[in-house]
Amino acid sequence: GNYSIKLRKKINTDNVEEIWNGDKEKEKLGVEYFGVGDLEVSHNDKLLAYSLDTKGSEYYKIFIRDISTNKLVTKEITDTSGSITFSLDDKYIFYSKLDENHRARKIYRHKIGDHLSEDYLVFEEKSEAFTVGISLTSDEKYYLITTSDHNTSEQYYFGVDEITPKPKLIIKRQRGILYSINSWANNFYNHTNNDAEDFKIDISSSLENQSWKPFVPSKNEVLIGGCVFLKNWIIRSETSDALDKLFIRNISTNFEEELIFSDEKVYVPNISLKQKDRNTDEIYLGYSSPKTPSRVYSYNLSDKSKKLVKEQEIPSGHNSEDYIV
Protein backbone atom coordinates (compact mmCIF):
# COMPACT_ATOMS: atom_id res chain seq x y z
CA GLY A 1 0.00 0.00 0.00
CA ASN A 2 0.90 3.68 -0.23
CA TYR A 3 -0.31 4.69 3.24
CA SER A 4 0.35 3.61 6.79
CA ILE A 5 -1.38 0.83 8.67
CA LYS A 6 -1.72 1.03 12.46
CA LEU A 7 -1.79 -2.28 14.32
CA ARG A 8 -1.97 -3.17 17.99
CA LYS A 9 -1.99 -6.26 20.15
CA LYS A 10 -2.46 -6.88 23.84
CA ILE A 11 0.70 -7.72 25.77
CA ASN A 12 1.38 -11.46 26.00
CA THR A 13 -1.10 -12.30 23.24
CA ASP A 14 -0.71 -13.00 19.53
CA ASN A 15 -3.99 -11.37 18.47
CA VAL A 16 -3.08 -8.46 16.16
CA GLU A 17 -5.81 -5.88 15.48
CA GLU A 18 -5.79 -3.41 12.58
CA ILE A 19 -7.24 -0.10 13.73
CA TRP A 20 -6.19 2.05 10.77
CA ASN A 21 -5.55 1.35 7.10
CA GLY A 22 -4.65 4.46 5.12
CA ASP A 23 -5.29 2.94 1.71
CA LYS A 24 -8.79 1.81 2.69
CA GLU A 25 -9.56 5.20 4.26
CA LYS A 26 -8.48 7.05 1.11
CA GLU A 27 -10.57 4.75 -1.07
CA LYS A 28 -13.58 5.23 1.20
CA LEU A 29 -13.35 9.02 0.90
CA GLY A 30 -12.77 8.92 -2.87
CA VAL A 31 -10.22 11.76 -2.82
CA GLU A 32 -7.17 12.47 -4.99
CA TYR A 33 -5.01 13.87 -2.20
CA PHE A 34 -4.77 12.14 1.18
CA GLY A 35 -2.46 13.48 3.87
CA VAL A 36 -2.49 11.99 7.38
CA GLY A 37 -1.40 14.39 10.11
CA ASP A 38 -1.73 12.40 13.32
CA LEU A 39 -3.03 9.06 14.59
CA GLU A 40 -3.64 8.93 18.35
CA VAL A 41 -5.28 6.22 20.46
CA SER A 42 -6.99 7.27 23.70
CA HIS A 43 -5.51 6.19 27.03
CA ASN A 44 -8.37 3.72 27.57
CA ASP A 45 -7.70 2.24 24.10
CA LYS A 46 -11.31 2.82 22.99
CA LEU A 47 -11.01 5.86 20.69
CA LEU A 48 -8.91 6.67 17.63
CA ALA A 49 -8.34 10.35 16.82
CA TYR A 50 -6.89 11.18 13.43
CA SER A 51 -6.35 14.25 11.26
CA LEU A 52 -6.61 14.44 7.47
CA ASP A 53 -5.75 16.92 4.74
CA THR A 54 -7.64 15.92 1.58
CA LYS A 55 -6.91 19.11 -0.41
CA GLY A 56 -3.16 19.59 -0.09
CA SER A 57 -3.70 22.81 1.87
CA GLU A 58 -2.01 21.50 5.06
CA TYR A 59 -5.11 22.56 7.00
CA TYR A 60 -6.15 19.36 8.75
CA LYS A 61 -9.56 18.14 9.86
CA ILE A 62 -9.65 16.14 13.10
CA PHE A 63 -11.95 13.13 13.46
CA ILE A 64 -12.54 10.90 16.49
CA ARG A 65 -14.03 7.45 16.12
CA ASP A 66 -15.01 4.60 18.41
CA ILE A 67 -12.61 1.78 17.53
CA SER A 68 -15.12 -0.98 18.28
CA THR A 69 -17.89 0.45 16.06
CA ASN A 70 -15.88 2.62 13.61
CA LYS A 71 -18.44 5.38 14.19
CA LEU A 72 -17.50 9.04 14.71
CA VAL A 73 -18.15 10.31 18.24
CA THR A 74 -17.72 14.05 17.68
CA LYS A 75 -18.12 16.58 14.88
CA GLU A 76 -15.03 17.10 12.71
CA ILE A 77 -12.75 19.94 13.78
CA THR A 78 -11.48 22.05 10.88
CA ASP A 79 -8.47 24.29 10.17
CA THR A 80 -6.10 22.61 12.62
CA SER A 81 -2.37 21.91 12.51
CA GLY A 82 -3.17 18.20 12.65
CA SER A 83 -1.62 17.34 16.01
CA ILE A 84 -3.85 15.73 18.65
CA THR A 85 -3.37 15.15 22.40
CA PHE A 86 -5.89 13.24 24.52
CA SER A 87 -6.56 14.25 28.11
CA LEU A 88 -5.75 11.52 30.64
CA ASP A 89 -9.44 10.88 31.35
CA ASP A 90 -10.15 10.69 27.59
CA LYS A 91 -13.00 13.19 27.89
CA TYR A 92 -11.12 15.88 25.94
CA ILE A 93 -8.60 16.41 23.19
CA PHE A 94 -6.23 19.35 22.87
CA TYR A 95 -5.51 20.73 19.40
CA SER A 96 -4.09 23.84 17.72
CA LYS A 97 -5.89 26.05 15.20
CA LEU A 98 -4.14 27.53 12.17
CA ASP A 99 -4.57 31.21 11.38
CA GLU A 100 -4.86 32.74 7.90
CA ASN A 101 -1.04 32.74 7.64
CA HIS A 102 -0.96 29.01 8.30
CA ARG A 103 0.53 29.38 11.77
CA ALA A 104 -0.63 27.48 14.86
CA ARG A 105 -1.05 30.19 17.48
CA LYS A 106 -4.00 28.95 19.56
CA ILE A 107 -4.40 25.82 21.69
CA TYR A 108 -7.97 24.66 22.32
CA ARG A 109 -9.52 21.96 24.49
CA HIS A 110 -12.49 20.12 22.98
CA LYS A 111 -14.84 18.00 25.06
CA ILE A 112 -15.60 14.91 22.98
CA GLY A 113 -19.23 14.97 21.88
CA ASP A 114 -19.79 18.67 22.64
CA HIS A 115 -20.44 21.40 20.09
CA LEU A 116 -17.27 23.04 18.75
CA SER A 117 -18.51 26.47 19.82
CA GLU A 118 -17.93 25.35 23.42
CA ASP A 119 -14.24 24.57 22.89
CA TYR A 120 -12.05 26.24 25.53
CA LEU A 121 -9.14 28.48 24.50
CA VAL A 122 -6.23 27.31 26.66
CA PHE A 123 -3.44 29.46 25.22
CA GLU A 124 -2.84 32.09 22.55
CA GLU A 125 0.54 33.17 21.19
CA LYS A 126 0.58 36.89 20.39
CA SER A 127 3.67 36.90 18.19
CA GLU A 128 3.05 36.08 14.54
CA ALA A 129 6.56 34.63 14.30
CA PHE A 130 5.94 31.83 16.79
CA THR A 131 3.92 28.60 16.54
CA VAL A 132 2.49 26.54 19.40
CA GLY A 133 2.04 22.88 20.28
CA ILE A 134 0.99 20.85 23.31
CA SER A 135 2.32 17.61 24.78
CA LEU A 136 2.19 15.47 27.91
CA THR A 137 5.19 14.94 30.18
CA SER A 138 6.59 11.42 30.50
CA ASP A 139 5.21 11.00 34.03
CA GLU A 140 1.78 12.16 32.78
CA LYS A 141 1.51 14.81 35.50
CA TYR A 142 1.67 17.95 33.36
CA TYR A 143 0.79 19.32 29.96
CA LEU A 144 3.46 21.41 28.27
CA ILE A 145 2.69 24.16 25.79
CA THR A 146 5.67 24.97 23.60
CA THR A 147 5.79 28.16 21.56
CA SER A 148 8.78 28.61 19.28
CA ASP A 149 10.36 29.79 16.07
CA HIS A 150 13.41 28.14 14.49
CA ASN A 151 15.91 29.26 17.16
CA THR A 152 13.94 30.43 20.22
CA SER A 153 11.49 28.58 22.46
CA GLU A 154 9.33 29.18 25.51
CA GLN A 155 7.22 26.74 27.53
CA TYR A 156 4.22 26.85 29.83
CA TYR A 157 2.80 24.08 32.00
CA PHE A 158 -0.40 23.11 33.80
CA GLY A 159 -1.47 20.07 35.80
CA VAL A 160 -3.39 17.24 34.14
CA ASP A 161 -6.12 17.54 36.79
CA GLU A 162 -6.76 21.27 36.30
CA ILE A 163 -10.44 21.68 35.43
CA THR A 164 -9.83 25.13 33.95
CA PRO A 165 -6.23 25.07 32.67
CA LYS A 166 -4.17 28.17 33.44
CA PRO A 167 -0.74 27.67 31.86
CA LYS A 168 2.22 29.00 33.88
CA LEU A 169 5.43 30.27 32.30
CA ILE A 170 8.50 28.10 32.97
CA ILE A 171 11.40 30.20 31.61
CA LYS A 172 10.89 33.48 29.75
CA ARG A 173 11.97 33.38 26.10
CA GLN A 174 15.41 34.68 25.17
CA ARG A 175 16.41 35.17 21.56
CA GLY A 176 18.55 32.24 20.40
CA ILE A 177 17.80 30.05 23.42
CA LEU A 178 16.00 26.73 22.95
CA TYR A 179 14.77 24.64 25.86
CA SER A 180 12.51 21.64 26.38
CA ILE A 181 11.20 20.50 29.76
CA ASN A 182 10.16 17.01 30.83
CA SER A 183 9.32 15.51 34.22
CA TRP A 184 9.97 12.12 35.74
CA ALA A 185 10.22 10.67 39.27
CA ASN A 186 9.61 14.05 40.96
CA ASN A 187 12.31 15.81 38.97
CA PHE A 188 12.24 18.18 36.01
CA TYR A 189 14.73 17.89 33.15
CA ASN A 190 15.68 20.77 30.85
CA HIS A 191 17.28 20.00 27.48
CA THR A 192 18.69 23.39 26.47
CA ASN A 193 21.37 25.25 24.53
CA ASN A 194 21.58 28.03 27.13
CA ASP A 195 25.34 28.48 27.68
CA ALA A 196 25.77 25.21 25.77
CA GLU A 197 26.08 25.48 21.99
CA ASP A 198 25.58 21.73 21.50
CA PHE A 199 23.03 21.43 24.31
CA LYS A 200 23.09 20.03 27.84
CA ILE A 201 20.54 18.60 30.27
CA ASP A 202 19.87 20.28 33.62
CA ILE A 203 17.77 18.97 36.50
CA SER A 204 15.57 20.69 39.12
CA SER A 205 13.21 19.31 41.76
CA SER A 206 10.72 22.14 41.23
CA LEU A 207 9.37 24.51 38.59
CA GLU A 208 7.89 26.85 41.19
CA ASN A 209 11.32 27.43 42.77
CA GLN A 210 13.74 26.51 40.02
CA SER A 211 17.26 25.47 40.96
CA TRP A 212 18.83 23.97 37.85
CA LYS A 213 21.88 21.76 38.29
CA PRO A 214 23.88 19.82 35.67
CA PHE A 215 22.55 16.35 34.83
CA VAL A 216 24.40 15.88 31.54
CA PRO A 217 26.90 18.75 31.12
CA SER A 218 27.74 20.19 27.71
CA LYS A 219 30.66 18.58 25.91
CA ASN A 220 32.99 20.02 23.31
CA GLU A 221 31.87 19.03 19.78
CA VAL A 222 29.30 16.55 21.14
CA LEU A 223 25.61 17.09 20.42
CA ILE A 224 23.59 16.14 23.51
CA GLY A 225 20.15 14.69 22.74
CA GLY A 226 17.08 14.37 24.92
CA CYS A 227 15.96 11.63 27.32
CA VAL A 228 13.51 8.73 27.25
CA PHE A 229 12.28 7.67 30.69
CA LEU A 230 11.28 4.24 31.99
CA LYS A 231 10.62 3.21 35.59
CA ASN A 232 14.19 2.02 36.17
CA TRP A 233 16.06 3.63 33.30
CA ILE A 234 16.94 6.87 31.56
CA ILE A 235 18.01 6.53 27.93
CA ARG A 236 19.68 9.42 26.15
CA SER A 237 21.58 10.08 22.93
CA GLU A 238 24.78 11.81 21.85
CA THR A 239 26.24 12.57 18.43
CA SER A 240 29.96 13.06 17.86
CA ASP A 241 32.16 12.64 14.77
CA ALA A 242 28.90 12.11 12.82
CA LEU A 243 28.15 8.95 14.86
CA ASP A 244 25.05 8.47 17.02
CA LYS A 245 25.39 6.84 20.43
CA LEU A 246 22.90 5.73 23.09
CA PHE A 247 23.55 5.82 26.84
CA ILE A 248 21.60 3.86 29.46
CA ARG A 249 21.41 5.09 33.06
CA ASN A 250 20.16 2.90 35.91
CA ILE A 251 18.03 5.22 38.04
CA SER A 252 18.58 3.35 41.32
CA THR A 253 22.39 3.18 41.04
CA ASN A 254 22.93 6.23 38.79
CA PHE A 255 25.38 4.10 36.78
CA GLU A 256 25.48 5.04 33.09
CA GLU A 257 27.02 3.13 30.20
CA GLU A 258 26.98 3.31 26.43
CA LEU A 259 24.71 0.84 24.70
CA ILE A 260 27.09 -0.93 22.30
CA PHE A 261 24.74 -2.68 19.95
CA SER A 262 26.90 -3.71 17.04
CA ASP A 263 30.51 -4.38 16.18
CA GLU A 264 30.03 -2.16 13.13
CA LYS A 265 31.67 1.22 13.57
CA VAL A 266 29.04 3.14 11.60
CA TYR A 267 25.37 2.60 12.39
CA VAL A 268 22.28 4.60 13.31
CA PRO A 269 20.38 3.48 16.43
CA ASN A 270 16.96 4.71 17.52
CA ILE A 271 14.59 3.66 20.27
CA SER A 272 10.86 3.63 20.88
CA LEU A 273 8.61 2.48 23.70
CA LYS A 274 7.52 -1.14 23.43
CA GLN A 275 4.39 -0.59 25.52
CA LYS A 276 2.41 2.33 26.94
CA ASP A 277 3.26 1.33 30.51
CA ARG A 278 6.76 2.57 31.33
CA ASN A 279 7.17 0.00 34.11
CA THR A 280 9.27 -2.24 31.89
CA ASP A 281 12.87 -3.09 31.08
CA GLU A 282 12.14 -3.63 27.39
CA ILE A 283 12.28 -1.21 24.47
CA TYR A 284 12.21 -1.43 20.71
CA LEU A 285 15.66 -0.69 19.36
CA GLY A 286 15.92 0.24 15.70
CA TYR A 287 19.19 -0.14 13.87
CA SER A 288 20.55 0.43 10.38
CA SER A 289 23.94 0.88 8.78
CA PRO A 290 25.45 1.37 5.32
CA LYS A 291 25.81 -2.43 5.01
CA THR A 292 22.79 -3.60 7.04
CA PRO A 293 19.10 -3.02 6.18
CA SER A 294 16.85 -1.53 8.86
CA ARG A 295 16.14 -3.89 11.74
CA VAL A 296 14.02 -3.60 14.87
CA TYR A 297 14.87 -5.59 17.98
CA SER A 298 13.11 -6.13 21.26
CA TYR A 299 15.88 -5.23 23.71
CA ASN A 300 16.00 -5.91 27.46
CA LEU A 301 17.90 -3.18 29.30
CA SER A 302 18.41 -5.35 32.38
CA ASP A 303 19.94 -8.51 30.95
CA LYS A 304 20.91 -6.98 27.56
CA SER A 305 19.18 -9.72 25.60
CA LYS A 306 17.73 -8.95 22.20
CA LYS A 307 15.27 -10.53 19.79
CA LEU A 308 14.82 -9.57 16.13
CA VAL A 309 11.18 -8.62 15.51
CA LYS A 310 11.32 -6.94 12.09
CA GLU A 311 13.78 -6.60 9.22
CA GLN A 312 13.56 -4.50 6.08
CA GLU A 313 13.07 -6.66 3.02
CA ILE A 314 15.30 -5.81 0.04
CA PRO A 315 13.45 -6.95 -3.13
CA SER A 316 16.67 -7.63 -5.02
CA GLY A 317 18.19 -9.52 -2.10
CA HIS A 318 20.99 -8.44 0.23
CA ASN A 319 24.16 -9.92 1.67
CA SER A 320 25.90 -7.66 4.17
CA GLU A 321 29.19 -9.51 3.62
CA ASP A 322 29.31 -8.00 0.13
CA TYR A 323 29.94 -4.54 1.60
CA ILE A 324 32.84 -2.84 3.34
CA VAL A 325 32.38 0.40 5.32
Briefly describe each language-model feature range:
Residues 183-202, 224-239:
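Loop/turn-rich, solvent-exposed surfaces of beta-rich toroidal or solenoidal domains
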Residues 45-51, 63, 84-85, 90:
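Well-ordered alpha/beta subsegment
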Residues 210-230:
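Generic long, charged, amphipathic alpha-helical segments
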Residues 1-5, 25-33, 52-61, 76-80, ...:
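A flexible loop/linker signature enriched in serine peptidases of the S9 family
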Residues 67-78, 114-126, 163-171, 209-217, ...:
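Blade-edge beta-strand/turn elements of extracellular beta-propeller
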Residues 45-49, 93, 143, 188-190, ...:
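Hydrophobic beta-strand positions that form the internal "hydrophobic ladder"
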Residues 1-40, 51, 131-183, 214, ...:
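Non-catalytic accessory segments flanking enzyme active sites
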Residues 7-10, 63-68, 108-114, 157-161, ...:
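Beta-propeller blade signature
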